[in-house]
């Protein structure tokens, strides 16, 4: 079981910014996300869409925002657990236990749920033939420009 100060569920912009703020205060965090990369919907669904509501940044794309946030948290050496779906959260004394679908277990006195509009997975085509082509010629998100 991995022990830390804070478990952050969600590696989107809010989860990544939380890492930064916690790091400034000297707190260690781990981040768990269902997706295969950090950035949440900003990077998964809208990497090229302009964002206009970030303080002190007149305009940036979802991809640029994600890159900036990842650069900003580098000094804190935060472990990102990607492709991990949280399956269980329960209290134990003064801590929280979090278990994932990949059998990872974490313990911390604090949890931040930064899931945005919630965890999401693509609606896959329900044809067995498509499963063989996933990641080759059938994609459910923008991977490369």
In which residue ranges do the predicted regions lie?
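FAD-binding core/adjacent interface of flavoenzyme oxidoreductases
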Residues: 1-9, 25, 80-145
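Glycine-rich FAD pyrophosphate-binding loop
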Residues: 7-9, 23-45
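Glycine-rich Rossmann-fold phosphate-binding loop(s) that bind the pyrophosphate
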Residues: 10-14
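Flexible, glycine-rich phosphate/dinucleotide-binding loops
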Residues: 15, 38, 60, 89, ...
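Residues at secondary-structure transition points
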Residues: 37, 49, 60-64, 128, ...
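N-terminal Rossmann-like dinucleotide/flavin-binding domain of flavoprotein oxidoreductases
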Residues: 43-105
